[in-house]
């Protein structure tokens, strides 16, 4: 699975979103109804899946599907 596919799967699993709703421009909060706890859990799942550390100030910037994919690709 590609990084993009793995990130999308985590988003579907963590937020209960439909796979077809998880597009690059999709916002976790505005489009998928995530709250701040959901986004924290999402970041933790990304850290675990990709064995990376995402500092809080960086985690706050991860608000869309594409921003999550970009962060993982740039920090692996």
From Swiss-Prot:
- UniProt modified residues of type O-(pantetheine 4'-phosphoryl)serine: 36
Q: Would you name any one GO CC term?
A: membrane
Tell whether Secreted is among the UniProt keywords.
no
Any idea which UniProt keywords this protein has?
A: Cytoplasm, Fatty acid biosynthesis, Fatty acid metabolism, Lipid biosynthesis, Lipid metabolism, Phosphopantetheine, Phosphoprotein
| PTM comment | 4'-phosphopantetheine is transferred from CoA to a specific serine of apo-ACP by AcpS. This modification is essential for activity because fatty acids are bound in thioester linkage to the sulfhydryl of the prosthetic group.
Q: Does the keyword Cytoplasm apply?
A: yes
Q: Cite the Carrier domain residue spans from the record.
A: 1-76
Write out the annotated subcellular location: Cytoplasm
Q: Which Pfam families match?
A: PP-binding (PF00550)
Tell me the InterPro entries matching this sequence: ACP (IPR003231), ACP-like_sf (IPR036736), PKS_PP-bd (IPR020806), PP-bd_ACP (IPR009081), Ppantetheine_attach_site (IPR006162)
Source superkingdom: Bacteria
Q: Where are the transmembrane segments?
A: none
A molecular function annotated in GO for this UniProt entry is: phosphopantetheine binding
**Family affiliation:** Belongs to the acyl carrier protein (ACP) family.
Role played:
Carrier of the growing fatty acid chain in fatty acid biosynthesis.
The protein in question is named: Acyl carrier protein
The organism is Glaesserella parasuis serovar 5 (strain SH0165) (Haemophilus parasuis)
The gene name reads acpP
């Amino acid at each position: 699975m590609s990084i993009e596919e793995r990130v999308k799967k985590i988003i579907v699993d963590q937020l209960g979103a439909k796979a077809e709703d998880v597009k690059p421009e999709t916002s976790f909060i505005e489009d998928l109804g995530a709250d701040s706890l959901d986004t924290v859990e999402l970041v933790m799942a990304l850290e675990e899946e990709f064995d990376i550390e995402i500092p809080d100030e960086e985690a706050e910037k991860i608000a869309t599907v594409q921003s999550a994919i970009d962060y993982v690709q740039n920090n692996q």
